[in-house]
C-alpha cells in the first residue's frame, strides 16, 4: 500500500511516482488548487491536488483534518519562493495522481499543533495526543534509549531475564498493589515494587550478569511527577566491586547520550560522598549546573548574642549555614519575602540575610536586621568564609541540620536558575558513602536509607549491632542535573550480615523468616558477592527530551490521582467478580446525611 514515509521524501525522489499513507495535518484551498499537509510518524509532506485531475480533486474537496489517506503521486520541486526550510521535505511536493480515503475522522477536539492544551484533554484523547509530532518524537526517542541500553548490555555479557509480576507482599516503604487470588481464597499477590529479591536470587543461581527493562508498581501518594507504574532499567552482576560497576554503568550512560543526543558527558563522572554533598549543597542529589555552595558557620555561632543562631549551633544535630548569592544585593524586599516564604515549605522559620554594599566601609557598608546581634569579628569571619563581594547577598539557615539542608539546598537551586547563574550543560556525578540507616522519629526506630539488602561498608559490620547510626553503606547513586537517575549498591551476600541488618531495623527473626525466608535460605547456598543498579527510564527520557513531566514520555500514563482518563481506570467491578475472588466490600456510611 505504501512505498515511502511522508517525512522521508526529499530531492532524491524527484520525478518518482510514490504512494504515501498518513493523516491530514492541514488542508488549504488556494485559488482552486487544494494543498494537503500529509503527516505520518516520520514527518510532513505537502500534497498538491490539481483541478485538472477531476476524480482526485473531487475526493480532495471532501477531505478534512485527521482523515487517513492513501495518496499516489509524482514528486516535484516546489515553485520558487515556496520552499519550507522548517521541514525535511520542504524542497519538494507531491502532485496527486490518485487519492483514497482510508477512513474519515470526526472533528478532533484539538489541533495537532496546539501547544497550549490542557493535560486532562490530552490524556482523555491520548490516542490523538500521541499523533502530535512532539509526542511521536518523545516515544521514538524512548525506543532509541532502550535499544542503546540493550545493545550495550548485550555487548557486555548481560542476559535479559524476566522476573515475576505476581509475587509476595513485603510491605516496607511504599504500599504494594495487591492482587487477590481466586484459587487461594483470602490470599493475595503483590505487584513488584522492584525485582530486587529475584535478581539477587538470579546471582545465587549463577546468572552472573542480568538485566531487565521492566515495569514496577508503587501504591504511594503521588508527588508532582510520579507514576503508580513506572519502568526501570534493572541490572545486577556478580564478582564485581562497586568501582567496576560504577565505571561500567557511567560508560553505558555516556554511550547512551552520545548515540541518542550526540552529547559528550565527562569521563569519568565526579564522585562526591554523601556527607560532602549535604555539607556543600544541602542535598544528596546536587545540581552541579548551579555554582553556588553552602558555607558552614555552626562553629562561629556557638556564643553569639543572636539566639536563633546560637541555639541551632549549640543543639546536637543543629546547623548554621550561609548561601552567598552573587549580585543578590539588588534583590528587593518583596523578592526576599518570597524566598522566605519558599524556604518555609521546608520547615525553615525565617530567612536572615546580609547585603554587602561596600566592603571598604566595614559594618557600615553592610545592610541587615541581624547585624546588631552579631559581633563584628563574627561578621568579618562570615564575609571571609563566604568570599562575599560588593553587591552580593548572604542568606542564612539556622535550625536542625535537616531543615537547614532542605531549605538552603532548595533555595540554592531556585536562585541559581531564576537568576541565570546555572550553566546550560549536563552535569552528572556519583554520590557514595551513604549512611546505612536513618532514624524515624515517629516510629522511634532505624530505617534503611536505601533498602535492607544493601551491604555495609567494609569494616562497618560491627556498627550494625553497636551503633547503627555510624554504619556507612556500599550504596551509590547516579545524579544528573539535580535528578537521581539511578541508584544501586553492593548487596549483602552473607546470611549472618543480612540477619544483623534485619535486627538493626527491628525486624524480628520470625518476621524476617516470614517475609524473606527464601532469601535467607538462598544466601546459605554459596551466594556470590554481587551488586547492581536500577535506572529510572521514564526520568532519563524526560530529561533527554526536555519534557516537563514524565507523563510526556509514557504512552499511556496515569494522572496525579493515579487514574487513566482514557479508559476510566480504576473502575468498579461486578459483584459476581468479587464473589469469585472471595472479597466483600465494606461500604462506609456518609456521616453528613
From Swiss-Prot:
CDD domains: AspRS_core (cd00777), EcAspRS_like_N (cd04317)
Molecular-function GO terms, alphabetical: aspartate-tRNA ligase activity; aspartate-tRNA(Asn) ligase activity; ATP binding; nucleic acid binding
EC number: 6.1.1.23
UniProt cross-references to Gene3D superfamilies, sorted A to Z: Bira Bifunctional Protein, Domain 2, GAD-like domain, Nucleic acid-binding proteins
Localization, UniProt: Cytoplasm
Pfam families registered for this protein in UniProt: GAD, tRNA-synt_2, tRNA_anti-codon
Any one biological process term the GO annotation gives: aspartyl-tRNA aminoacylation
Ranges for region Aspartate: 196-199
Main location: cytoplasm
Subunit structure: Homodimer.
Protein name: Aspartate--tRNA(Asp/Asn) ligase
Biological source species: Nitrosomonas europaea (strain ATCC 19718 / CIP 103999 / KCTC 2705 / NBRC 14298)
Organism lineage string: Bacteria, Pseudomonadati, Pseudomonadota, Betaproteobacteria, Nitrosomonadales
Gene: aspS
Amino acid at each position: 500500500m505504501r512505498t515511502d514515509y511522508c517525512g522521508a521524501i526529499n530531492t532524491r525522489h524527484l520525478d518518482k511516482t510514490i504512494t504515501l499513507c498518513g493523516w491530514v495535518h492541514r488542508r488549504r484551498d488556494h485559488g482552486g488548487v487544494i494543498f494537503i499537509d500529509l503527516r505520518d510518524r516520520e514527518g510532513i509532506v505537502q500534497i498538491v491536488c490539481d483541478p485538472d485531475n477531476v476524480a482526485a480533486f473531487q475526493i480532495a474537496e471532501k477531505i478534512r483534518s485527521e482523515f487517513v489517506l492513501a495518496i499516489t503521486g509524482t514528486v516535484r520541486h516546489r515553485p520558487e519562493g515556496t520552499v519550507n526550510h522548517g521541514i525535511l521535505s520542504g524542497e519538494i511536493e507531491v502532485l496527486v495522481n490518485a487519492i483514497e480515503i482510508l477512513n474519515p475522522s470526526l472533528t478532533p477536539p484539538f489541533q495537532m499543533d496546539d501547544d497550549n492544551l490542557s493535560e486532562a484533554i490530552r490524556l482523555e484523547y491520548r490516542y490523538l495526543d500521541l499523533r502530535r509530532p512532539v509526542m511521536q518524537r518523545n516515544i521514538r526517542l524512548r525506543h532509541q534509549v532502550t535499544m542503546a541500553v540493550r545493545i550495550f548490555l548485550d555487548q557486555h555479557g548481560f542476559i535479559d531475564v524476566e522476573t515475576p509480576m505476581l509475587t509476595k507482599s513485603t510491605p516496607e516503604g511504599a504500599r504494594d498493589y495487591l492482587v487477590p487470588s481466586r484459587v487461594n481464597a483470602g490470599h493475595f499477590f503483590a505487584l513488584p515494587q522492584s525485582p530486587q529479591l529475584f535478581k539477587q536470587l538470579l546471582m545465587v543461581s549463577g546468572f552472573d550478569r542480568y538485566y531487565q527493562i521492566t515495569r514496577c508498581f508503587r501504591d504511594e501518594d503521588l508527588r508532582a511527577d510520579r507514576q503508580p507504574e513506572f519502568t526501570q532499567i534493572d541490572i545486577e552482576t556478580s564478582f564485581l566491586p562497586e568501582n567496576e560497576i560504577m565505571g561500567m554503568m557511567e560508560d553505558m550512560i555516556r554511550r547512551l547520550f552520545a548515540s541518542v543526543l550526540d552529547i559528550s558527558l565527562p569521563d569519568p563522572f565526579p564522585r562526591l560522598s554523601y556527607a560532602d554533598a549535604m555539607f556543600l549543597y544541602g542535598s544528596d542529589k546536587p545540581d552541579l549546573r548551579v555554582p553556588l555552595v553552602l558555607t558552614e558557620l555552626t562553629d562561629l555561632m556557638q556564643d553569639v548574642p543572636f539566639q536563633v543562631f546560637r541555639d541551632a549551633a549549640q543543639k546536637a544535630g543543629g546547623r548554621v549555614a550561609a548561601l552567598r548569592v552573587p549580585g543578590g544585593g539588588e534583590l528587593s524586599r518583596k523578592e526576599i519575602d518570597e524566598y522566605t516564604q519558599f524556604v518555609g515549605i521546608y520547615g525553615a522559620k525565617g530567612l536572615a540575610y546580609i547585603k554587602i554594599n561596600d566592603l571598604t566601609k566595614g559594618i557600615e557598608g553592610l545592610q541587615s536586621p541581624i547585624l546588631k546581634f552579631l559581633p563584628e569579628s563574627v561578621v568579618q569571619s562570615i564575609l571571609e568564609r563566604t568570599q562575599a563581594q560588593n553587591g552580593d547577598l548572604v542568606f542564612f539557615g539556622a535550625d536542625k541540620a535537616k531543615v537547614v539542608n532542605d531549605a538552603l539546598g532548595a533555595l540554592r537551586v531556585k536562585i541559581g536558575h531564576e537568576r541565570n547563574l546555572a550553566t546550560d550543560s549536563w552535569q552528572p556525578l556519583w554520590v557514595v558513602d551513604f549512611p546505612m540507616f536513618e532514624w524515624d522519629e515517629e516510629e522511634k526506630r532505624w530505617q534503611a536509607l536505601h533498602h535492607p539488602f544493601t551491604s555495609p561498608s567494609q569494616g562497618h559490620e560491627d556498627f550494625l549491632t553497636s551503633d547503627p547510626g555510624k554504619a556507612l553503606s556500599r550504596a551509590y547513586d547516579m545524579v544528573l542535573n539535580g535528578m537521581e537517575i539511578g541508584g544501586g549498591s553492593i548487596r549483602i551476600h552473607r546470611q549472618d550480615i543480612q540477619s544483623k541488618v534485619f535486627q538493626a531495623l527491628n525486624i524480628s527473626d520470625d518476621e524476617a523468616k516470614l517475609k524473606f525466608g527464601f532469601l535467607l535460605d538462598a544466601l546459605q547456598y554459596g551466594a556470590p558477592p554481587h551488586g547492581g543498579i536500577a535506572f529510572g527510564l521514564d526520568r532519563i527520557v524526560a530529561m533527554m527530551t526536555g519534557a516537563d513531566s514524565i507523563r510526556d514520555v509514557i504512552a499511556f500514563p496515569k494522572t496525579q490521582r493515579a487514574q487513566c482518563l482514557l479508559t476510566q481506570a480504576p473502575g468498579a467491578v461486578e459483584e459476581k467478580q468479587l464473589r469469585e475472588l472471595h472479597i466483600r466490600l465494606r461500604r462506609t456510611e456518609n456521616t453528613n446525611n
